[in-house]
């Protein structure tokens, strides 16, 4: 689980936009960039080279994702 305070502070390094946390996959999602940044051992890996590209069929913002807006 990622601390809510950390989620409030972090932004996408590519776009500067907000991130959502996918608890099932342990990833920080940037819908604007279409990327998912991994969270390993509770540490967000905020490197574009480490991010996975989102697939079109993946959940959109607000569906089963925790974001800094959901407080």
UniProtKB/Swiss-Prot annotation:
The source's domain of life comes to: Bacteria
SUPFAM superfamilies found in the cross-reference section: Trm112p-like
Mind telling me which InterPro entries this protein's record contains? Answer: Trm112-like
Ranges of Basic and acidic residues compositional bias? 52-63
Region Disordered: what ranges? 52-71
Extract one GO cellular component term from the record. Answer: cytosol
Family that this chain belongs to: Belongs to the UPF0434 family.
Q: Which HAMAP family match?
A: UPF0434 (MF_01187)
Q: What is this protein called?
A: UPF0434 protein APH_0052
């Amino acid at each position: 689980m990622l601390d809510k305070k950390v989620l409030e502070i972090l932004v996408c390094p590519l776009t500067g936009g907000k991130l959502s946390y996918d608890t099932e996959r342990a990833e920080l999602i940037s819908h604007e960039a279409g990327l998912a940044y991994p969270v390993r051992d509770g540490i967000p890996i905020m490197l574009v080279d480490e991010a996975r590209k989102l697939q079109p069929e993946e959940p959109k913002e607000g569906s089963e994702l925790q974001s800094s807006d959901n407080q």
